[in-house]
């Protein structure tokens, strides 16, 4: 990792803090797919998880360290509370990476000290440097975070930062854990650290923030102006509660407005050199991948990657854009990887054309996954005259980006109408290989299907969200269904796509149940509460 003071280090925590979004549970293969996409995107550091949280988290971090943390790849980071057990777990999980980092933390705000840790300032001032020094026995790259720094006493914050830097911390991260600060306050906090921590020049100042007041990105940009050189963010801004600072928004703000930010990094104002290492043309593909795998849809008006981000409905705006895009667009859609080159495939398109177009869209499938997706494509081509890139994305997502198929839907039939009681019959293959058939009635066809499935699966759950949207226009469009289930306080998402939304609804429900069932099978004996910064 390049630690030059004239550029911004991008630290991605999609796989750690982002996965703490309700319903965003990922399996090992999905985490690896996202990590590979983040490496292609060009992030400097990937926080791959919290190794002590569970055996599954440990294995995922270790696998990412081995397969993505190569000599030319990003630094792989693991989170650890300021305890020897956590730090040892992180150190062991990160061993395979060429470049690794342990990120350890402890709370410093008075409210956290009193009610969560039940420790004094003196206790924490002793623990933090001791644990940083212990982390240094595993790696030379150690990051320390004073949790809830935004509400901590500045003088105590200066003390603890000086102590951990003396103990060997190479990065000190300042989290606005509850999204409480405003840009002016957060900028002043970073400025105060720069001016009052005597050894601050020996460490990189990082920032981490939550979006509870919608100010995370603005806070980060103000922090950059005051000396922050690492930004901790997530794809699509996913994360606990209202989420984290969005990587794509930060990167494009620094890209589009670099002439404004250049002087704050000691550069000539007119320098065209990028302020980050991000390959912006990978942004859109990475956004879609994360959305697909987590089941967290991107709102249409989301900055940079939303469906409407480059759409113009006003006649005046449309006229201006047609004459010159700069009239109403401050950035080129192609700069984030969007393209107007929509190649239409049909039933006469062959396997090679299919593979080629998927590669152009950023999908690198194994032969087995390609075979499954191609068969699905040919089936769809018999129903639709033209298949667009959006259709292809839905096919790949539905066929290859699913949890382990513990329960498999073999058959679904429904009977309904305005003068009939909705009835559903389903056949499911269980994890033990048995085929079980059952039926149920409901308030509608989807309700009947879900009741019939529950009679077979018998895993208690609560359906808390059901949504369906058209992938493309037209009466023959693919319908994409996303659902969320709650079980014992945890949320599991599922998705599926089909030209028949009843079938898609059934498959989405099975997808979510498979995630839930897989989670129940995991050994959670060593699963501490999920950490939060």
From Swiss-Prot:
InterPro entries: 2-IPM_HCS-like, 2-isopropylmalate_synth_dimer, AIPM/Hcit_synth_CS, Aldolase_TIM, LeuA/HCS_post-cat, LeuA_allosteric_dom_sf, LeuA_bact_synth, PYR_CT
Keyword Transport attributed: no
An individual GO BP term: L-leucine biosynthetic process
Protein keywords: Amino-acid biosynthesis, Branched-chain amino acid biosynthesis, Cytoplasm, Leucine biosynthesis, Manganese, Metal-binding, Transferase
EC supergroup of this enzyme: transferase
Annotated Mn(2+) binding sites: 17, 208, 210, 244
PROSITE patterns given in the database record: AIPM_HOMOCIT_SYNTH_1 (PS00815), AIPM_HOMOCIT_SYNTH_2 (PS00816), PYR_CT (PS50991)
Subcellular location: Cytoplasm
Enzyme Commission designation: 2.3.3.13
Pathway: Amino-acid biosynthesis; L-leucine biosynthesis; L-leucine from 3-methyl-2-oxobutanoate: step 1/4
Residues making up the signal peptide according to the UniProt record: none
Limits of the Pyruvate carboxyltransferase domain: 8-269
Cofactors demanded by this protein: Mn(2+)
Reaction(s) this enzyme catalyzes, per UniProt: 3-methyl-2-oxobutanoate + acetyl-CoA + H2O = (2S)-2-isopropylmalate + CoA + H(+)
UniProt-listed Pfam families: HCS_D2, HMGL-like, LeuA_dimer
GO (cellular component) term, any one: cytoplasm
CDD domains: DRE_TIM_IPMS (cd07940)
Region named Regulatory domain: 408-533
GO molecular function (one): manganese ion binding
Family: Belongs to the alpha-IPM synthase/homocitrate synthase family. LeuA type 1 subfamily.
Record text on subunit structure and interactions: Homodimer.
Function: Catalyzes the condensation of the acetyl group of acetyl-CoA with 3-methyl-2-oxobutanoate (2-ketoisovalerate) to form 3-carboxy-3-hydroxy-4-methylpentanoate (2-isopropylmalate).
Name by which UniProt lists this protein: 2-isopropylmalate synthase
Organism: Picosynechococcus sp. (strain ATCC 27264 / PCC 7002 / PR-6)
Encoding gene (name): leuA
